[in-house]
Amino acid sequence: MERTLSGVESQLVLELEWDKKRIVTIDDVARILRCRRNEARVIAHRLEKKRWLERLRRNRYLFIPAERGEMGVPTMNPLLVGSLLVEPYYYSYSTSNAHYGFSTQMRPTLYLATTKTRRSFRWRNSQFRFVTLSRHKFFGFQEVEVLGVKVNMAEPEKTVVDSVDKLKYAGGVQEVLAVICNGLRKVDAERLVEYARRMRNHSLIQRMGYLIDVLLNEGVASFPEDERERLLPHVGKAAIYLDPAGEKSGRLDKAWRVIGNVPRSELLSEVQIR
């Protein structure tokens, strides 16, 4: 079907173009055209068939502006789509690890940190997972350009900290060790420690300190001793397991109060020993 528009449809599209709308709801259509929701749904359905709108979920559409050409080719950048689904947000965990080259694992799920609660969402071949953070943890991100699109991405230091904070969203403890190994070559150590302390999470500090020591002992990474010392006062009294999902046994590291329940060979499986 051609992208030709009726008078009412033209009014809506011009308004959306003028407002630079990316996401359009049925309520938006009803408000702009001053019509009932049932009428708005019919109009939205027609515009979907004419490739001016692409359905994201019930009553929610991606607007495909005139600049996308006569065929109405929608955007193919899932990072753009994700950025339009929730506010505030920033990409983190496996997604930002891949962006900075801290991980070579390419995962189909895109992880967005937010202070809101949102259900997971699928668009084409991409799965979006929304990770709800407390407000004091929602910091340390910047605007970056990816494939011509500007999105919010965790800073390198916050990427590492977030990954240690929520291991399962970064591929598990073995993958996170590799992330730290690669990240320590690029991040600012002082900022890394400061961000870790700002999270107000003893377990995070304990795991990060333990994993940094593993890399130091293997001789595959370096870390300033004074920054390591800044972490130690924030070690909690309670001992924790390195891998929360692992075996409930292992040797206790007294400095970090971490029970190493992952065999060394398994823990280092994702780290390139040089």
Where are the language model's segments positioned?
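Short beta-edge/loop segments at beta->alpha junctions of small alpha/beta modules
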Residues: M1-P88, R185-I205, D213
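Short N-terminal helix-initiation segments at or just after the protein's N-terminus
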Residues: I23-D27, A40-V42, A98-Q105, G236-E247
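Short gly/ser-rich loop at a beta-strand->alpha-helix junction or flexible surface loop bordering the NTP-binding
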Residues: I26, H45, K49-K50, R55-R68, ...
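A residue-level signal for conserved active-site and pocket-lining positions in enzyme catalytic cores
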Residues: V29, S96, V160
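Generic structural signal for bulky hydrophobic/aromatic residues embedded
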Residues: I32, H99-Y100, S163, L211
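Hydrophobic/aromatic-lined pockets within catalytic cores
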Residues: R34, E48, G101, D165-Y169, ...
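Short amphipathic alpha-helical segments with coiled-coil-like heptad repeat character
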Residues: R37-E39, T104-M106, K168-G172
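Hydrophobic alpha-helical interaction segments
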Residues: Q142-R274
